Design a protein with these regions (language model features):
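Acidic, turn-prone loop/beta-hairpin segments
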Residues: 1-87, 91-113, 139-141, 146-156, ...
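Cys/His-coordinated zinc-binding microdomains
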Residues: 27, 170-173, 190
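Short glycine/threonine-rich loop-to-helix capping motif typified by GTGT followed
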Residues: 110-126
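A glycine-rich helix N-cap at a beta->alpha junction
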Residues: 124-140
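Flanking scaffold residues of small Cys/His-coordinated metal-binding clusters
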Residues: 161-164, 181
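Short cysteine-rich clusters marking metal-coordination/redox-active sites
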Residues: 166, 186-189
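Short linker/helix segments within small regulatory modules
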Residues: 175-184
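Short metal-binding segments enriched for Cys and/or His
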Residues: 192-198
């Protein structure tokens, strides 16, 4: 993503919070290793940068707590990802695809259960679902596919993704090569590279 892009900054923040917490947790056991990590990482203003042992253990981050509705939505995403992974594995076994990033996934909502599940997923774009499933493309359509085990209201099917492979993100996209400055990149990666080059 862009250097100051929200997704990139969010991922960096999450990774930093995990590193900060794990370094403090392991410090009594791996004192020298954790101290070396502590010396190399950035710190919050209230933390003592001299040694990891001189700092309080992190408390749960209330700012990042999810509401029950958000927890339910993410549980649904995890269950749906598990169902999609089963369909991907079957497609691999049938030699339809090699790797997950070569896949185009179609989700077929079925009946009221499917409609309710799709309403919970309405905050996600198909590009975000593709990122969560680690596939090239996701489409939502009418029809039938393999029945889900964990999310019975949504069926899924897999086919080979159309287009060329982007050499940066490895996703297959029909518009790889559309950007003359970056002929081997998909539009998203070409946009990101342009912002980095400025």
């Amino acid at each position: 993503e862009e250097t100051d892009g929200m997704e990139r900054r969010s991922a960096q923040t999450a990774l930093w919070l995990i590193l900060d917490t794990m370094t403090k947790l392991f410090a009594p056991i791996l004192a020298f290793t954790c101290d070396e990590i502590w010396q190399a990482m950035p710190h919050r203003g209230e933390e003592d940068g001299r040694n990891v042992i001189l700092n309080e253990m992190n408390q749960p981050f209330a700012d990042y707590a999810l509401s029950p509705a958000e927890m339910e939505k993410w549980a649904l995403v995890e269950d749906l990802r598990d169902d999609v992974n089963v369909v991907l594995e079957n497609a691999r076994n049938e030699k339809k695809i090699g790797k997950a990033l070569e896949a185009h996934v179609v989700l077929y909502p079925q009946g009221d259960e499917g409609k309710q599940a799709m309403e919970k997923l309405s905050g996600f774009t198909t590009d975000q679902l593709a990122d969560l499933f680690i596939v090239s493309d996701v489409e939502i359509a009418q029809g039938t596919g393999a029945a889900g085990v964990k999310v019975p209201g949504i069926q899924a099917a897999v086919s080979e993704a159309k287009g060329e492979k982007c050499e940066r993100c490895w996703k297959h996209h029909i518009k790889v090569g559309a950007d003359k400055e970056h002929p081997t990149l998909c539009p998203r990666c070409a946009r990101v590279i342009r912002t980095i080059e400025l």
